[in-house]
Amino acid sequence: MHLVRGFVLVATLSWSATVEAAEPRSPPPKVFESGHTATPATATSKAPVDQLIPWLLSEDRELREIPFNEVIVRVTGKKMVACDPKNQIDERVVKSISAACDETVKRLNAPDSAIKNIARINEVSGHFEDMLRELLNATPGLNCDFPRTAQGRVMRSGYPDLRIVDLASKRVFYLDPKLYAAGSRDSSFRAFYFEPKIATNKVRDDAVHFIAGFEHEPREKSGRWNFTRWDLVDLAQFRVKLKAEFQGSNHDMYRPEAIVATSAK
């Protein structure tokens, strides 16, 4: 949503630790992702930014306790299906994912693991995605790959990371691996985000949505990472909050015409 040159409104959905009573809220201003209002601006109508700012301030800049399944439906038009432990298909897929998680931890904890010399945990995530994809795609009866956008593009960034298909039923399961440090399980810091954009949307099926959370200990002096447990989380009851912020890049800030002084060479 382009509001002011060099700035965009970013919607970030993150884990919400506290449950708050739902309150009636005013509808958001009718501003589209492109930055256009629902009707052409006139001398008496307000510009998009003039509509948006008062609404953000009145909502305390955050919307809390939003059901993530409703976000998915509104943004993508696809339903989020709850995992049913009594359903044979769900049970079979959960069992296969569990086995893949066990094997992933085993392989990436090995002394000769590819992640041994990676210093930043954020750079380890891709190895979990690749390993889970490889193992699940090799599981009889399943297909696992990176989800594609409507234009057929593979995007590694953004939610979700993996798309699993049960070949017999053609049902789809989305899987998003997350890594977290031991002791931070109850942290209120952001651990999840979803950016609602049509062009980069990767949720294109009615599906079960899973998070696979892997816990790790502090990195050892030898450079080794040790993962100690994992949990498979159904996001059907997941609630999120929306936080709006205005942001700009270095390119936006350091424009030649905006620089008023510079250090001596």
Which residues fall in each region the model found?
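Boundary at the C-terminal end of the N-terminal hydrophobic targeting segment
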Residues: S16-P24
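Short, charged, amphipathic alpha-helix that recurs within catalytic cores of restriction-modification
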Residues: Y180-H216
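Bacterial N-terminal signal peptides
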Residues: G6-W15
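Conserved catalytic cores of phosphodiester-cleaving nucleases, focusing on short active-site segments
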Residues: L162-I164, F173-A181
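A short acidic/basic microdomain associated with nuclease active sites
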Residues: E129, R133-V165, S169
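Positively charged n-region of N-terminal signal peptides that target proteins for export
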Residues: M1-R5
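Domain-level recognition of nuclease-like catalytic cores that cleave nucleotide substrates
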Residues: V203-A264
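Interdomain/boundary linker segments immediately adjacent to catalytic/signaling cores
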Residues: P28-M131
